[in-house]
Amino acid sequence: MALTPMMVEYMKTKEEYNDCILFYRLGDFYEMFFDDALTVSRELELVLTGKNCGLEERAPMCGIPHHAAAAYIPRLVTKGYKVAICEQLEDPKQSKGIVKRGVVKVITPGTFIDSNSNLENDNTYLMVISEYEDKFGIAMSDISTGEFKTTSFNNIKMSLLDEISKVSPKEILVDININEELLTEINNVLPVLITKKDFNEFLVSKEELIEQFSDLEVSGLTIEREIPSKVLLKYINETQKMSLTNINLLEQYEIINYMTIDGNSRRNLELTESIREKTKKGSLLWVIDKSATSMGGRTLRKWIDEPLIVKDEIEKRLSGVEEVFNSIGFNEDLRSALKEIYDIERIVGKISNKNVNAKDLLSLKSSLDKLPCIKELLKNTSSELLKGYYENLDELIDVRDLLNDSIKEDPGLGLKEGNIIKDGYNNLVDELRESKLHGKEWIAALENREREFTGIKSLKVGYNKVFGYYIEISKSNYNSIPEGRYIRKQTLANAERFITEELKVMEDKILGSEEKLINLEYSIFVEIRDKIEEEISRLKKSARIISDLDGISTLALVALENDYIKPEINTDGLIKIIDGRHPVVEKVIGKGDFVSNNTALNQTDKELLLITGPNMAGKSTYMRQVALITLMAQMGSFVPATSANISICDKIFTRIGASDDLAGGKSTFMVEMWEVSNILKNATSNSLVLLDEVGRGTSTYDGLSIAWSVIEYITKNKDLRCKTLFATHYHELVKLEGILPGVKNYSVAVKKLKDSVVFLRKIVEGGADESYGIEVAKLAGLPENVINRAREILEDLEGKNTFDINKVSSCSMVSNNIKEIAVDSTKNSEDKVISNAQNIDVNETSCKDTTKEKILRVETQNAEYEEAIKSLKSEITKLQELNKKHNKKHKDVSNDNMQINFEVMEKENFIKELSEVDILGLNPMEAMNTLYRLVTDAKKLQ
């Protein structure tokens, strides 16, 4: 059996769009067949039926009314499906044979604009990622606003993932040959639809790129930016089936011109959505976005995502906010005008996409009506930013006048229903309307006349699209109908419908006028739309100014409402905040209940603030607060404090909270270590780093060792030494102040009562002496017997704990000194063994000395160590010889006054293990553990 002719045409179209759900227009319905029908039926919960397709079995089918498609398509697209719309391209009544059909648009997550969405303040980005030699190239576009940008950077995976996290595209295009490992990581960062294309073939020519933009813009592209731009434009043209005129500016940007914030940090700081609810509420954007327009809302989000790092640019924006902040009346008038402005960017996008309607153009006219008022308000401003807005704002008077003269104030819902064009704009429209009006009057007169003639008061003249005009008489009055007066047209259950020759003639006149009027109004509307389309560049420029102005106005309003202050900006590495507050927490609990805190960070004595204190005391909130205040200052916003002087940070990193990646096979601790590793590899001396409870995911001593080692790495690495907030529950680490450069102790103030503690939420100088873990557990409601038993166990453990950080620190310094001697005096592995062995010559007295005394002692003992190295070298050689001969000798090794006798040296593995230990390559805690194990093994040989 063969497929029916219609189904053959369907299969041809489906083969071309096999990665899409095909909406196939049949009459008044979009129909889906086979697998598409099964998918749509499942996802949209529609009834699944069947259709005879010429095969033995009926084809699975489901459908939706064409006028209801707008309600169903968004549900499919948000689930990650692509939808191809196949329309009838000719009138079925005039078609000979199979109706000609074709795909008129492909709707994908990256190209879909839902006018009914409540996310109008969000951008819908489509992104292309390409690799060329040692560079990543990115191009992105929001076709609804006409934005089209490109950038490139070194082939550093983290930079790519950070950019994806920042932009948050709805769809990503990659080359078919992309590295699968990279693809997996992209999916882990942002699980969106990824479309693969062959970038060698799927791209427009350079000439097409120039035609879309300009020769000047395209000639400035490097090859790594040109490739993704060509691919992106190709995909837009392929899905939209047309060239979009609102995409007329190709912007290049550099990622180094904005603060870098990786995906983890964006999530931890809750910049645009809360961690728990994944919604805007509870985020920084929720606090700041009081925008008057949708365009302003999108601008504020961009400013949060891309804080500035150039001092002049930050201060320019701050000065603009300050001027509006200082003039409350000005801002009230400005916001009153801004609230009357619709989303000009997206209306322009609809004009370009040929799907704008009359109400959209009325919204545009209403928006343009407010531009003269806004320009007048800006006339006397003094800041560089606002003066620039005044000088560059185009009032678009000609476009406004065109719309004012042509579009009716109450237009019809559909463009093919008429009632669009104003009276007086077109003479022919006026004449046809007059004819239509007279026709309707004639119909009303006919109805009255026939009622009087027949005496049937219920007689009426009606109309429908199938039968046209008719005279309807109920069956109860059937006997009153004059014989031969009417021609029967239709019989109903309770009535009869008739026509007359006179009515038929008038019907042709009326319907002819209506059809001509509808077609004429539509053609005039298209002319108006095309005239406005010619001014898209001007419209976009004014829309950009309005959106930026709304952003400035909103920042001023938020500052006024929340008692924010203008921060000072410096490049000296100093962050000084007086009475800083967390903008989101303060908004939730109320300003009066929030405890403010001071912060002082620099690149000398307060490089790393070591913050100790119990859980739930507010350490994490304080750390996030410092990061958010820094970010707000660099985006040009006032900040929640009484005073703030902020050093420009090139990057913000955070390691806060516990998480795991079970799907990726990573434990909580593994994820934590991966995040810390990423920070240590990518932070610079100008970065701000927040580390919370490093080492929490493993055993106490392992965690303590890692936390200590990370602090050492940050403070001792001359190429790093970044501003760091390091919160920990290892209160033993407070002794690092004075030992490591730049470490300063702070803690959360706690008021300890008889059986409980009160968290004062105040950050004070000095370290905490205990963790108050049991008190926190009690507050959480653990049973009393569990709490009491925990106290007993704690007392027992504390009695046995002999850990001394000063002792380990001394060992570390001696080890470092020996390492220097070893480098100078020995060049082979045997010398390295001797140098390692020397690490045991530390006595208990030296570990109790002050730091200065320890340093002096180390310096004076260098000569003794050199002699000891020679002596130990000789002894080790003897041991190796004795071992080969299986002779038993005696030798003593001293460690903290402990004597160990090696009487039996037959086991080669002990000597081998001792010779292979690289104790200088271990951190102090690892060195102690290794030494302890070797001593234990040695005892077994006695």
From Swiss-Prot:
A Pfam family this chain is assigned to: MutS_II
Positions that bind ATP: 613-620
Keywords on record: ATP-binding, DNA damage, DNA repair, DNA-binding, Nucleotide-binding
SMART domains associated with the record: MUTSac, MUTSd
UniProt-listed GO biological process terms: mismatch repair
Function: This protein is involved in the repair of mismatches in DNA. It is possible that it carries out the mismatch recognition step. This protein has a weak ATPase activity.
Record protein name field: DNA mismatch repair protein MutS
Organism in which the protein naturally occurs: Clostridium botulinum (strain Eklund 17B / Type B)
